[in-house]
Amino acid sequence: MTLLPIKLPPGMYKNGTELDAAGRWFDGNLVRWVEGMMRPVGGWQQRTTTALTGKPRAILTWRDNSATRHLAVGTHSKLYAISQSSVITDITPTGFTPGNPDATVGGGYGTGTYSYGFYGVPRPDVGSVTPETTWSLDTWGEYLVGCSNYDGKIYEWQLNPANKAAVVANAPTGNTAILVSNERALFALGAGGDPRLISWSDLENNTVWTPSSSNLAGSIELQTGGRIIVGKRVRGQILVLTDIDAHVVSYVGQPFVYQSEYVGRACGIPGPNAIAVQDNFAVWMSTRGFFTYDGYIKPLACEVSDYVFSDINTAQLSKVCAVNNSQFNEVWWFYPSASSQENDRYVMWNYADNYWSVGTMARSAGTDRGVFSNPIFVGTDGILYDHEVGVNHAGSTVYVESGPVQIGNGDNVYYVNELIPDERNQGDVTATFFSRYYPNAAERSYGPYSMTNPTSVRFNGRQINMRLTASPNTDWRVGTMRLNAQPGGRR
């Protein structure tokens, strides 16, 4: 008899064929690895019970000067302030222009010349995408500032629930996004409707925008063929991403105040929320891959990119949102699969251990813990959820499945009659095995087995896949399992 350890490295591999994932985890949902041991992602619970009006696209948390905690959420049609006790207040500005819940694509069905091209062959990229409406939110001191990319005006809310957010006087209109610099200038991106223009206010005064010898207001026109999508504070600078490239804006003092530098090509971002900033680096999902910025732009190798980008709704790609989960050194991206108009899947990267994981979850915005004790995600249903709370996953199946585990070189048939589990609490997880003789041969399943120590099983094959399924609401742990296997012949 041979004791075969099933010791697979953390993370999933979903590029190429299933055989390419030999010796790796291949699929799963709501699992992570901590110090090499597999466990479930934390559960969630509702923070609010009333759905917000409109599609939520942005969320911000902060403390005011009295240490009171605040939360703001922007939807395509509303702006909300939510107190630390979860009281929801509509602070939508008077005269605000609601936008679009979904992205729209020009050049679709009914456009172009009839019978042009061949059936089943993708047409040239001649259409234009109008993104769904989202907000960029930041703080000006203890006050909230924000801008909807559809309405284009810059608003400020001064914490009084009885008052709506109000237009910032003298600020440009028709803007794409805003942010506040480390030097306390309010930035307008895509300012005045110019997709390449960046304007900023005087330092410490967000109502002075006209440059003069007595202030530090100004503007920069980026040298790019793209349009500005988003800006984020990173490493003491401002990283500005367009739909095709990347630029860095740095403070240089008088007379220019700020200057821009082109730092990367073919690394654009599809939507303003697809980027996360963690400590001293930024990471974002592009249209066909991932990139990081830590002073230099670098592509990020992704072991599940085939799976993600082969089944994604490219027309709604601007809805992708990235969320830090610093407690576990993770960045999560929520994205719409090809058959969905809204985000229904996630891809997660652990930047400390450099592994990837995938699963299903419907979230449209989120924020890391810090101001509040837990990460807060916003569902596509308009409900806010506290995450990493217990292990209740609202009925979602928690599982992980391996790629082929070949015994030896895979040329001999093995007969397996016993499983020796490695669980923290036996019975929390069931095991199902799938065996086949050749990579494309018919697959046979065995189980599920409720694991005891040891567990009697009976199956054979040249390659074996294993699926572990967790019982609901269990905080399980799985280490290195072993199979008791007897080698047979080559047939």
Report each predicted region and the residues it spans.
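Beta-propeller and closely related beta-pinwheel folds
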Residues: 42-60, 95, 117-130, 161-319
